[in-house]
Amino acid sequence: SLFSLLNKVIHINNLESGIIRLMITRGDSNKTSPVFNMPCIYISIKPFYSIPIKPVKVVYLDETNYPIIRFTPAIKSMNYIGNMLSKRDCEKQGGYEPVFYNKDKIITECAIRNIFFIKDKVLYTPALELGILSGVMRETVLNIAESIDIEIKETYIYYDDINSMDEAFISSTGIGLLACYWDNWESKHHYTNLIKKELFKRIKNS
């Protein structure tokens, strides 16, 4: 069973805590036939890496410079080449995570994470119709914000407007929530820290 396979991988790698990824494809197929063989199963595992305590730097990049395809509705693709190339370029500029904007200069998402902004106690995050993934952590953050009376707006956020924001943070299952900053902009992250505190409380009690 899948559970026995996952447990075997955990046991072989001797990890008490970490991140495990399960991927199941439709199997091999030749180019001329719509018929697929037995599904292929891929399992990868890695230990939790050190998560920064202080706010991390993000770098805004034009996603049209990378081989990134957005689908509507979004899918979890296994092609990360564009994301990894952008991570490399981000790190060259001293950044932790790249944040993309599209051809219309609308913010979409990070290379492997979601981006959120706060202004006047309103939480802004890019709309799903832009072709971004609605991950587990993204939905959790929205739920937490709502529970502590922070208004939510899933909308178009223009690159030219980011410096007017009060706060910003990124999120993913692997890191939880990280406050962020960028060149010539920083924040005290008041509401960000409230959301993060509630997130840790939920994780601890789960």
Each predicted region: which residue ranges?
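Helix-start/capping segments and mature chain N-termini
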Residues: L2-H11, T25, T32-S206
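Short secondary-structure junctions
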Residues: H11-G18
